Curated annotation (Swiss-Prot):
PROSITE patterns the UniProt entry points to: AA_TRNA_LIGASE_I (PS00178)
Species annotation: Hyphomonas neptunium (strain ATCC 15444)
SUPFAM superfamilies for this protein: An anticodon-binding domain of class I aminoacyl-tRNA synthetases, Nucleotidylyl transferase
GO (cellular component) term, any one: cytosol
Protein name according to UniProt: Glutamate--tRNA ligase 1
Keyword field contains Nucleotide-binding: yes
């Protein structure tokens, strides 16, 4: 059997990180088993589905490199097929026309709740309470339609829905790749609506038909769909179709164990891109969010394909840890090719200011030595601020203190030696500074602070010799001269 997985988001909002993790798991499982990974956009909710959300989902998938093996399937394009299956099931006797109206169903639920509340009243006997709770339980139980047994319609032209004839009784079991053996009683399954009164298919029917028609062999999705599985399997059985293997993945919680919300960082996937995270880092982090393989913490794309299996997914909800994500991102930033990293930070740099060719050259020269200066692209881009700061530099409090009269006096002697240098390189600059210190009896602790203040204005920067090399002779001497003349 050739493995076929799918990711099936609804375009009612942006792709959040929980959905991105589900897509990743499906992608990796297909790749690990030499199968195909497909994408279906479940856009049957006409009121809430938008093209903007669809585009955002596709954009996020492209950014993560989770490319489907075939063009995306739009669920709304299959509505005629969905309806045909429902009518076929009616003909087979596994589905039926139901004439119960939404108003009647709501009245049933309201009456059930009314009786449940009445059972809480004081002054009623235990027998009355028991009777009320029994009636409430029956009214609020999964709905079994009176028309499932062939009751006549109220009128020849009465509107109807098409409902699944749910299994009568007995245990219903699903062997889940993550949750293990899960069993419920058939009485917990309702006669679910497959076609609405206007003839449009419901989600429950559409998912099953599409998964069958797309040849899906393994369904990996959030565990909020676990109960749906027991409602969907009877549709497969009614049509005589093979039932796919199911694996239901626990939800992602916040670092406090509470349900994930925006306060935990539950942003759209592309928001993390805008925050300066690399796609390979995002995938590596999401992979370990609820999945493990030995003691290894970080996986490359290639390693993940080689070892991923649903058996490594934990049953307990994973906890989002943005500090861990930042650590993983910093790791992949250090591994990234210099030219790619430069291209990625350019948009961030351009937001700060317009860079001259000379400033761009400085950043290119410094980049290989400064990859560890941030855990996101934004932090890294900001770390280069000292290279494109405009003269005369604005000094922070510590820089002003370092450039006291005594500090400037020490700096003046070094400035004269730097002017006399015939070759400008990190090594020659370092040697000149050492020679100056030896000749004057000063230590680096005495000359370093005023020199750093003059070159960076107090902004964070690496060792001084490479900084002066990246700035170049002209800019270095000009920055020092600005402070000596000030």
């Amino acid at each position: 059997m050739s493995v076929v997985t799918r990711f099936a988001p609804s375009p009612t909002g942006m792709l959040h990180i929980g959905g991105a993790r589900t897509a990743l798991f499906n992608y990796l499982f297909a790749r690990r088993n030499g199968g195909r990974f497909l994408l279906r956009i479940e856009d049957t909710d006409r009121e809430r589905s938008t093209q903007e959300a669809t585009d955002a989902i596709l954009d996020a998938m492209e950014w993560l490199g989770l490319t489907p093996d075939e063009p995306p399937v739009m669920q709304s394009a299959q509505v005629d097929r969905h309806a045909a299956v429902a009518h076929d099931m009616v003909a087979r006797g596994t589905a039926f026309r139901c004439y119960v109206t939404p108003e009647e169903l709501q009245a049933r639920r309201d009456l059930g709740e009314e009786k449940r509340q009445a059972a809480k009243q004081e002054g009623i006997s235990d027998a009355e309470k028991e009777a009320l709770l029994a009636e409430a339980s029956q009214l609020l139980a999964p709905f079994r339609s009176p028309y499932r047994d062939g009751a006549s319609p109220p009128s020849p032209d009465a509107p109807f829905t098409v409902r699944l004839r749910a299994p009568e009784s007995g245990p219903r079991t699903v062997e889940d790749g993550v949750q293990g053996t899960v069993t419920i009683d058939a009485s917990e399954i309702d006669d679910l609506v497959m076609l609405r009164a206007d003839g449009t298919p419901t989600y429950m029917l559409a998912v099953v038909v599409d998964d069958h028609d797309m040849g899906i062999t393994h369904v990996i999705r959030g565990d909020d769909h676990l109960r749906n599985t027991f409602r969907q399997v009877p549709i497969y059985e009614a049509m005589g179709w093979s039932v796919p293997n199911f694996s239901h993945v626990p939800m992602i919680h916040g670092n406090d164990g509470a349900k994930l919300s925006k306060r935990h960082g539950a942003l759209s996937t592309t928001a993390y891109r805008d925050m300066g995270y690399l796609p390979e880092a995002m995938k590596a982090y999401l992979l370990r969010l609820g999945w493990s393989h030995g003691d290894q913490e970080i996986f490359t794309d290639e390693e993940a394909v080689q070892v991923f299996d649903v058996s490594g997914i934990n049953k307990a909800p994973a906890r989002l840890d943005l500090d861990k994500l930042a650590t993983v991102n910093a790791h992949f930033m250090r591994l990234a090719a210099d030219e790619r990293l430069f291209d990625l930070i350019c948009p961030v740099l351009s937001k700060n200011c317009s860079l001259s060719d000379a400033e761009v050259a400085r950043i290119r020269a410094a980049l290989p030595h400064m990859k560890d200066r941030g855990s996101t692209l934004i932090e890294l881009a900001n770390a280069f601020a000292f290279l494109y700061a405009k003269r005369p530099l604005e000094l922070n409090k510590n820089a002003v203190k370092a450039l006291s009269d005594e500090g400037k006096l020490r700096l003046k002697g070094l400035y004269d030696d730097l002017q006399r240098m015939s070759q400008w390189s990190g090594a020659s600059i370092s040697e000149t500074i050492k020679s100056y210190c030896a000749a004057t009896g000063l230590s680096m602790g005495q000359i370093g602070p005023p020199l750093r203040a003059a070159l960076t204005g107090g902004l964070p920067a690496p060792d001084l010799a490479p900084v002066m090399d990246w700035l170049g002779r002209e800019e270095t001497l000009a920055r020092i001269d600005d402070q000596l003349a000030g």
